[in-house]
């Protein structure tokens, strides 16, 4: 099993806009679990907001194999979400992929 973790830094500075983006990102990303083959799970969680410098959102997903992760990364539905996020929603991201077990 492969774990794919992405932390997101959002572009908006307005707290209300940021919150709307967090909700929409969570909805769009978690919906991919039902349409992309090889996905075991996709979870998206907002930061607790205790420390201001923390990034506000993290994606934790699991895949059957590295091949399944590779297919996810190029899947048209995933690319559509990425394109939407890259259009002024996300300022930066950090990704870690690793084998579980």
Tell me the role of every PLM-derived stretch.
Residues 1-55, 64-71, 97-101:
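Short S/T/G/P-rich N-terminal loop/turn motif that feeds into the first structured element of a domain
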Residues 66-96:
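C-terminal structural segments of small proteins and small subunits
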């Amino acid at each position: 099993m492969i774990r794919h973790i992405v932390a997101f830094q959002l572009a908006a500075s307005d707290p209300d806009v940021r919150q709307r983006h967090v909700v929409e990102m969570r909805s769009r990303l978690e919906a991919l679990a039902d349409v992309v083959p090889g996905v075991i799970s996709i979870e998206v969680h907002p930061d607790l907001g205790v420390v201001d410098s923390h990034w506000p959102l993290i994606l934790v997903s699991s895949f059957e194999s590295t091949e399944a992760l590779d297919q996810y990364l190029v899947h048209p539905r995933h690319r559509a979400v990425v394109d939407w996020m890259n259009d002024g929603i996300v300022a930066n991201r950090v990704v870690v992929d690793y084998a579980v077990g």
